């Protein structure tokens, strides 16, 4: 798109119709709605990139610019025009938008409104700083094409592509990225290929949004920058040469990296015109959260045609706490391993691009604590990179630098390696010096098995430790002259979990070339936290040779034996300059006990790894570094390098023997105690390296805490190998703070427990009491509760069905029915069930008469419970009613006595109710007991007060012990033929409408009978003659249960099944009696 188009676009933005027509053309296909698609294409898409099918670097740029508020401006010539976007989008409309979807002018206008003067000015600046679009043809990124990312500023989905938050969409970005050397590793943008140090990032103030990716490309000394705001996911796709990566690649960053030498980043020795896509899968374990990318600055590599120049990070003057500095958020790294405020300055190689020493790159982990750390200029370093670790840990001594991933780097002699997302950004010296080891060669990764293994198929590839291990990207040579190459190990848990947690890569050993002036500074820094944290096996001595390093050693380094633990790139030399390591340099083996010597056998290493580690942990006092120096002789170095370049101790002292040449004295390799993990190699064979910086007591404590934390976070789940191992691994979980509890404390705890237990018991008892009270209330109810009514209805229904069956059976086979009925009645009596009797009032009468005597006999046995005269027995009724023999019957009126009886029936369950109750009860009882007989009388005139079948069940208890009872029953029977009905009604709730009247009549008759008995001079113990009868029916009077039964029965009367209550009662009584 030319400037005219840009101005045209600006004109159109104000006119919705014109814009719509311009964007969609007469076809008005909403699918071609590039702005809408770019900004709002898929509200549900997490991808930052436009759909690969229609995502062109140009369109992507436009979407990004629109979203970023850096929309195309007059000043920014865009390589692609809206017309191109329209064609592209029409040809492949974004999936989320259907053609029939109405075009939302408001959204488009709002989106276009994001283009502000500030963004226009910024674009103009970029345009001015970037070469004309003609460079685009040269595969140099066009400024406009520099934005290969399409991103909606706040829209979760872009280009209708739905991406898992962590997953990276491999969207091929337009061919415009042809030879761009931008590399993305492990969710981080790596600064590569910036040949123009003069490039400065725009002020952080210009950058809006917490997460930004800035692409800084310098082509022909015209760096371009693109800022992407709010990169929600780690989906960053960098496209190398013109080939587009398959859009459907899932689960990884698609990185096309083509360097002049080929994909050196990925270790491709051949420089292919087409960048090779590399997919770096994201491991969910690498991300503690979705990958918020904060201000990632990507520096574009040189054009393939340009000479390969040292790639240096172009640091912007350090702006403390500002994101304008290179801010890289450790997406993949678990920050707990990183230390806060670790600063390390990269030394640019002497030939390195001009970087003002004042310019430092801040890699700020924008997580909880962003402490501005003053970048420390390393001696002669062009700039320093300051990493603020989320740990918030105090800064380590300046001489010592911890990469958040626990690499310890000395600011002075070492190019600072940044662990970002577990990958180290490394500055590359402009040229590899013989003394320098190409980072590719040197990159070593500690395998979880404690073996160095080449985790990545390509040497250039960064080794990503899923844990917090820091990895050097071998693709770039990061060692500057005199700067040691640092090898990073996998996370401490890989080390066997014994390594201190903090140092995922504490295993890194640094060689400080004594020859380089820097080396002295380096000796000063110790890998201390890292090494100390790491078990020996975890440490890899980083081998770096000073620029003066002997070339002969370089081959040895490169020749690192495959057996060597560096599985990592064993110093693979693809595109590597032999990195001669001067023999004079000694590998600093900060490996724990094991000497720096690496056993060729990974297994051995693994075996001893834990032991060495333990030893390291156990060691608190630094081992004389001189040992290391002694142990590692120049002569030995070649062997170490050849066998195990890292000079990594196998992790156990035993390993040295297996190592052979690498068997440099284990002691020496352990040279430093974990606390003094940094072991420095003498610059010269005869020289003794400078003493490692002594750690303070606070540092020791901090290290121990970090190790304990690391063990806790990544515990070693292997079996305990020895008592010491057990103690070492478990002790950190049993560190107690404070004093032992005193007796007072124990008493206090006991008291608290007692209080709680007492309260619990009280609550339990209260609940129990409440339950019992409810039961009592239910028993005292005159009218049955709803539950009982339902139960009675069900029983009544069953009884009716049973009665109908019995009637049919009686008609069909009377004799057989009688025989069965008698047997069943006996069974019912024995068993708490008299349903048939109840069902059949008539039949039940007979049987109930028999039952009643039995029940009465039982009652008589039980009468002792009741008053002697009353022989009151208590029978439990399902309603929790206790049926007792009739108590004293008072002469009070039937209705009054009934009321009292019901009222007091519950109250005086175990005592003969007062005469009122008794009197009332007697009628009831009589109706139940004597009337029961009467009721039964229907079938048998006055048999023993064969209480209704119900009664037998409920009252079955009451038996007339005395002849009076019989006479009373007879009288009752005679007097109240309806008593049966009454009983039936009362007891069973016959459901007849008459029950009340019948009950009243029955009660009257019962009273009369009782009075007659009294008058007859029957001397019942009870005050009333009826009392005798009552005594015979002892269960009646005292039994509130009877009253309850009566209550129940009364409702039952209305219900109309007399037998139901009696069945329940009889069953319960039978059980109780049994």
UniProtKB/Swiss-Prot annotation:
Phosphoserine modification, residue list: 621, 976
GO process annotations (BP): chromatin remodeling; negative regulation of cell differentiation; positive regulation of cell population proliferation; positive regulation of stem cell population maintenance; regulation of transcription by RNA polymerase II
Amino acid composition bias (Polar residues), ranges on this chain: 544-576, 591-603, 620-629, 660-680
Highest taxon above the source species: Eukaryota
Annotated Gene Ontology cellular component terms: chromatin; GBAF complex; SWI/SNF complex
InterPro entries registered for this protein in UniProt: Chromatin_remod/trans_coact, GSCR1_dom
UniProt function note: Component of SWI/SNF chromatin remodeling subcomplex GBAF that carries out key enzymatic activities, changing chromatin structure by altering DNA-histone contacts within a nucleosome in an ATP-dependent manner.
Subunit structure, interactors included: Component of the multiprotein chromatin-remodeling complexes SWI/SNF: SWI/SNF-A (BAF), SWI/SNF-B (PBAF) and related complexes. The canonical complex contains a catalytic subunit (either SMARCA4/BRG1/BAF190A or SMARCA2/BRM/BAF190B) and at least SMARCE1, ACTL6A/BAF53, SMARCC1/BAF155, SMARCC2/BAF170, and SMARCB1/SNF5/BAF47. Other subunits specific to each of the complexes may also be present permitting several possible combinations developmentally and tissue specific.
Protein name per Swiss-Prot or TrEMBL: BRD4-interacting chromatin-remodeling complex-associated protein-like
């Amino acid at each position: 798109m030319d400037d005219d188009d840009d101005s045209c676009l600006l004109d159109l933005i104000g006119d919705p119709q014109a814009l719509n027509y311009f964007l969609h053309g007469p076809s008005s296909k909403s699918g071609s709605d590039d702005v809408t698609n770019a900004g709002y294409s898929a509200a549900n898409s997490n991808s930052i990139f436009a759909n690969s099918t229609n995502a062109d670097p140009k369109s992507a740029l436009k979407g990004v610019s629109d979203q970023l508020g850096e929309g195309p401006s007059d000043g920014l010539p865009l390589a692609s025009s809206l017309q191109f976007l329209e064609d592209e989008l029409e040809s492949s409309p974004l999936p989320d938008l259907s053609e029939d979807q109405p075009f939302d002018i408001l959204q488009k206008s709002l989106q276009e409104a994001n283009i502000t003067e500030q963004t226009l000015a910024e674009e103009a600046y970029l345009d001015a700083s970037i070469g004309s679009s003609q460079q685009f043809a040269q595969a140099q990124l066009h400024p406009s094409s520099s934005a290969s990312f399409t991103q909606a500023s706040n829209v979760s989905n872009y280009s209708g592509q739905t991406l898992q938050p962590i997953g990276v969409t491999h969207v091929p970005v337009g061919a415009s990225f042809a030879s761009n050397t931008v590399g993305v590793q492990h969710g981080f943008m790596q600064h590569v290929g910036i040949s123009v140090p003069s490039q400065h990032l725009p002020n952080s103030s210009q950058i809006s949004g917490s997460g930004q990716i800035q692409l800084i490309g310098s082509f022909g000394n015209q760096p371009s920058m693109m800022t992407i705001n709010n990169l929600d996911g780690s989906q960053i796709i960098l496209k190398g040469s013109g080939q587009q990566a398959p859009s459907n690649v899932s689960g990884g960053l698609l990185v096309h990296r083509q360097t002049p030498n080929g994909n050196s980043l990925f270790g491709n020795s051949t420089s292919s015109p087409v960048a090779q896509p590399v997919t770096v899968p994201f491991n969910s374990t690498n991300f503690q959260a979705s990958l918020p990318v904060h201000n990632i600055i990507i520096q574009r590599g040189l054009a393939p045609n340009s000479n390969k120049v040292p790639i240096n990070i172009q640091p912007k003057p350090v702006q403390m706490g500002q994101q304008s500095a290179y801010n890289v958020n450790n997406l993949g790294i678990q920050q707990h391993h990183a230390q806060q405020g670790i600063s390390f300055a990269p030394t640019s190689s002497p030939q390195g691009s001009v970087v003002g020493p004042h310019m430092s790159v801040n890699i700020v982990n924008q997580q909880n604590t962003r402490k501005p750390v003053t970048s420390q200029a390393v001696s002669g370093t062009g700039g320093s990179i300051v990493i603020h670790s989320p740990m918030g840990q105090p800064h380590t001594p300046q001489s010592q630098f911890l990469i958040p991933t626990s690499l310890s780097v000395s600011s002075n002699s070492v190019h600072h390696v940044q662990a970002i997302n577990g990958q180290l950004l490394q500055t590359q010296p402009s040229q590899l010096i013989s003394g320098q080891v190409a980072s590719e060669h040197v990159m070593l990764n500690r395998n979880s098995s404690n073996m160095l293994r080449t985790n990545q198929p390509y040497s250039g590839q960064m080794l990503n430790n899923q844990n917090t291990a820091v990895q050097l990207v071998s693709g770039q040579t990061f060692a500057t002259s005199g700067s040691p190459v640092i090898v990073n190990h996998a996370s401490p848990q890989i080390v066997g979990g014994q390594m201190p947690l903090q140092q995922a890569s504490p295993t890194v050993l640094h060689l400080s070339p004594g020859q380089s002036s820097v080396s002295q500074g380096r000796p000063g820094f110790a890998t201390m936290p890292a090494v100390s944290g790491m078990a020996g096996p975890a440490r890899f001595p980083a081998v770096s040779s000073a620029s003066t390093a002997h070339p002969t050693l370089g081959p040895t380094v490169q020749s690192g034996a495959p057996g060597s633990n560096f599985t990592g790139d064993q110093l693979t030399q693809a595109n590597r300059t032999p990195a001669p390591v001067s023999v004079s340099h000694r590998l600093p083996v900060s490996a724990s006990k094991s000497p720096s010597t690496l056993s060729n056998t990974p297994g051995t290493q693994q075996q001893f790894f834990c032991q060495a580690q333990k030893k390291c942990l156990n060691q608190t006092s630094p081992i004389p570094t001189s040992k290391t120096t002694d142990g590692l002789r120049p002569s030995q170095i070649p062997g170490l390098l050849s066998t195990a370049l890292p000079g990594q101790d196998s992790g156990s002292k035993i390993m040295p023997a297996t190592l052979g040449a690498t068997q440099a004295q284990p002691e020496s390799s352990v040279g430093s105690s974990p606390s003094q993990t940094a072991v420095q190699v003498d610059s010269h064979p005869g020289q003794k390296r400078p003493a490692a910086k002594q750690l303070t007591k606070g540092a020791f404590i901090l290290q121990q805490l970090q190790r304990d934390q690391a063990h806790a976070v990544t515990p070693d789940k292997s079996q305990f190998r020895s008592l010491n191992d057990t103690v070492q691994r478990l002790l950190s979980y049993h560190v107690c703070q404070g004093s032992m509890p005193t007796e007072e404390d124990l008493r206090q705890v006991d008291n608290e427990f007692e209080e709680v237990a007492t309260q619990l018991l009280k609550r339990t008892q209260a609940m129990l009491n409440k339950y019992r009270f409810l039961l009592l209330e239910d028993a005292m109810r005159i009218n049955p509760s709803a539950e009982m009514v339902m139960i009675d209805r069900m029983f009544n229904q069953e009884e009716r069905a049973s009665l109908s069956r019995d009637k049919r059976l009686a008609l069909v086979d009377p004799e057989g029915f009688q025989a069965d009925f008698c047997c069943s009645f006996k069974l019912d009596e024995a068993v708490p069930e008299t349903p048939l009797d109840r069902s059949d009032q008539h039949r039940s009468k007979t049987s109930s008469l028999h039952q009643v005597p039995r029940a009465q006999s039982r009652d008589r046995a039980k009468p002792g419970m009741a008053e002697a005269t009353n022989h009151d027995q208590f029978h439990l009724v399902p309603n929790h009613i206790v049926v007792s023999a009739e108590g004293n019957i008072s002469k009070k009126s039937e209705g009054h006595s009934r009321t009292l009886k019901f009222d007091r029936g519950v109250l005086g369950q175990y005592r003969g109710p007062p005469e009122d109750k008794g009197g009332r009860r007697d009628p009831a009882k009589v109706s139940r007991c004597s009337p029961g007989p009467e009721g039964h009388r229907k079938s048998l005139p006055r048999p023993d007060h064969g209480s209704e079948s119900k009664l037998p069940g409920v009252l079955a208890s009451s038996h007339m012990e005395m002849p009076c009872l019989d006479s009373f029953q007879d009288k009752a029977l005679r007097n109240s033929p309806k008593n049966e009905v009454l009983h039936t009604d009362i007891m069973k709730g016959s459901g007849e409408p008459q029950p009340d009247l019948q009950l009243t009549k029955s009660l009257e008759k019962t009273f009369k009978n009782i009075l007659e008995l009294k008058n007859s001079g029957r001397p019942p113990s009870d005050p009333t003659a009826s009392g005798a009868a009552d005594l015979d029916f002892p269960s009646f009077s005292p039994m509130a249960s009877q009253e309850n039964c009566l209550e129940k029965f009364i409702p039952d009367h209305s219900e109309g099944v007399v037998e139901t209550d009696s069945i329940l009662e009889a069953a319960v009584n039978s059980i109780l009696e049994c």
